[in-house]
């Protein structure tokens, strides 16, 4: 039998639950939760983020990368 978890956690949108209306590119601690170890943006199907907030999240991460607040890739 495959190594499946006993139960599947229900995905929920963190931004809707916490009442966050706008995602700021300067909030690095929040953005790091949605970037993988190798620097890629984690998709909404894994995080459970709504499409509206996922678009804001992508834009905020791209802006933070451009301003060198977040790395583009991992530390080799």
UniProtKB/Swiss-Prot annotation:
GO molecular function, a single term: structural constituent of ribosome
Listed InterPro entries: Ribosomal_bS18 (IPR001648), Ribosomal_bS18_CS (IPR018275), Ribosomal_bS18_sf (IPR036870)
BP-aspect Gene Ontology terms: translation
Keywords: Ribonucleoprotein, Ribosomal protein, RNA-binding, rRNA-binding
Positions of transmembrane segments: none
A GO-annotated cellular component: cytosolic small ribosomal subunit
Superkingdom per UniProt: Bacteria
SUPFAM superfamilies cross-referenced by the UniProt entry: Ribosomal protein S18
Complexes and interactors: Part of the 30S ribosomal subunit. Forms a tight heterodimer with protein bS6.
Family per record: Belongs to the bacterial ribosomal protein bS18 family.
Function (record text): Binds as a heterodimer with protein bS6 to the central domain of the 16S rRNA, where it helps stabilize the platform of the 30S subunit.
Annotated protein name in UniProt: Small ribosomal subunit protein bS18
Organism for this UniProt entry: Nitrosomonas europaea (strain ATCC 19718 / CIP 103999 / KCTC 2705 / NBRC 14298)
Taxonomic placement: Bacteria, Pseudomonadati, Pseudomonadota, Betaproteobacteria, Nitrosomonadales
Gene: rpsR
